[in-house]
Amino acid sequence: MATNFLVHEKIWFDKFKYDDAERKFYEQMNGPVAGSSRQENGASVILRDIARARENIQKSLAGSAGPGASSGPSGDHSELVTRIASLEVENQSLRGVVQDLQQAVSKLEARLSALEKSSPAHRATTPQTQHVSPMRQVEPPSRKAATATEDDEDDDIDLFGSDEEEDKEAARLREERLRQYAEKKAKKPALVAKSSILLDVKPWDDETDMAQLEACVRSVQLDGLVWGSSKLVPVGYGIRKLQIQCVVECRWGRPLERSHQVEEHVQSVDIAAFNKI
């Protein structure tokens, strides 16, 4: 009962909360104003810098136009005159250098012509060296006489004499060597060239039995003929041709043209490829 009277008392216990909220509100309201003031201060600094730069530009323009502006076109004319004078001086110096070079070249040409004229006379005045042959040993007369007699004795001998016994022996040796050569050549096997041929065997029509056709082709047996692999290649309209490989010795022509066993099945035989082995 002692605390019930406080219910009827009108006291604001949460006033500090509202005070804090009001303070924060006014702080937020005043915040942008301070930022804008700082922005205005920065803008004023930039404007001052721009004004200072303009003043410097105007001063520099005034300084460059001060002494030169009074001269005007006469200053430019004087500068051109000085440049032309310097170019003329340089031209004169270059002409002098060119003249010196021309004189040096003319002197060199004169010297070369003089050397060319004097070169034959110089060659004529040079002493000619005599060619001295090497010394030869002189043999004594006794040795010369001995060699002369020996040469006469050698001349008496007939190296190409026709002795019957020597002729028979030479003929026998020649015949023996020819016989040995013939035997050696006969023992050596003769090399026979071989060729690899790819044949195109075409049937009469699409009803031809290709297996029987291939059997007929392989039935052809000749010396030096070896049949290889084969395959069927379509030609058109249901007709197929037989491609067969064979190795033959180069002693006869087409093997199938000589055979009459395959005429019932084979229309034609063509050589598709030919290679030497």
Swiss-Prot record:
Transmembrane segments: none annotated. One of its GO terms (cellular component) is eukaryotic translation elongation factor 1 complex. The keyword Protein biosynthesis applies. It comes from the Eukaryota. The modification Phosphoserine is found at residues 37, 44, 60, 86, 106, 119, 133, 162. The modification Phosphothreonine is found at residues 129, 147. The keyword tRNA processing does not apply. One of its GO terms (molecular function) is guanyl-nucleotide exchange factor activity. The modification N-acetylalanine is found at residue 2. Pfam families: EF-1_beta_acid, EF1_GNE. The modification N6-acetyllysine is found at residues 17, 107, 117. Keywords: Acetylation, Elongation factor, Phosphoprotein, Protein biosynthesis. Gene3D superfamilies: 3.30.70.60. CDD domains: EF1B. The modification N6-succinyllysine is found at residue 117. Residues 149-168 have a biased composition (Acidic residues). PROSITE patterns: EF1BD_1, EF1BD_2. Residues 113-171 are annotated as: Disordered. EF-1 is composed of 4 subunits: alpha, beta, delta, and gamma. Belongs to the EF-1-beta/EF-1-delta family. EF-1-beta and EF-1-delta stimulate the exchange of GDP bound to EF-1-alpha to GTP. This is Elongation factor 1-delta. It comes from Ovis aries (Sheep).
